[in-house]
Amino acid sequence: MILIIDNYDSFAYNLVQYVGEFDDVTVRRNDAIDVEGIHELDPDGIVVSPGPGTPAEAGVSIDVFAETEYPALGVCLGHQALCAAHGTPVGHAPSVVHGKPSEVRHDGTRLYDGVDDPFEVGRYHSLAVKASELPDTLSETAHTNDEQGIVMGVQHAEKPHIGVQFHPESILTDAGKQIVENFCTGIAKA
């Protein structure tokens, strides 16, 4: 079973549909569960959804990455929560991007198995992290293929925690379903 933390965003239910093709799904709002409740559910993996606001305003989202060892995928706000959980400043992106495609390069790690490099992604965000501010515990796995090189993916060095700034569940993202499948059937089941 995959637990989806819903950060009060309609995109969460696109993720529910994708994840539901590969595993059973349980959804909890970010303020309706705590770490103890997560342990009681004992999921195979956790997806922390996109949402409005900042990681500090996203209920249990930061705690998923700071206080659990479950395989976890953070999407957009979830990605920012992963970064914030490990001390990375989350600030304004160089430009606000909502509903726009971008070309992204990735490093070929497990999340990107079967995904072309580069590939198109759908972006919907005004916040971002800088590669130069990532701690040693997080490594960049994807970035925009342009002069800005905005961080689009990170992975924890020891925990099975991964973040993507883009939206794999967006129709604008090539191979988005493949990315979700890679998490559900590979990373969460490892």
Swiss-Prot record:
GO terms for biological process: L-tryptophan biosynthetic process. The keyword Electron transport does not apply. GO terms for cellular component: cytosol. It holds the Pfam family GATase. It comes from the Archaea. Component I catalyzes the formation of anthranilate using ammonia rather than glutamine, whereas component II provides glutamine amidotransferase activity. This is Anthranilate synthase component II. The lineage of its organism: Archaea, Methanobacteriati, Methanobacteriota, Stenosarchaea group, Halobacteria. The gene is trpG2.
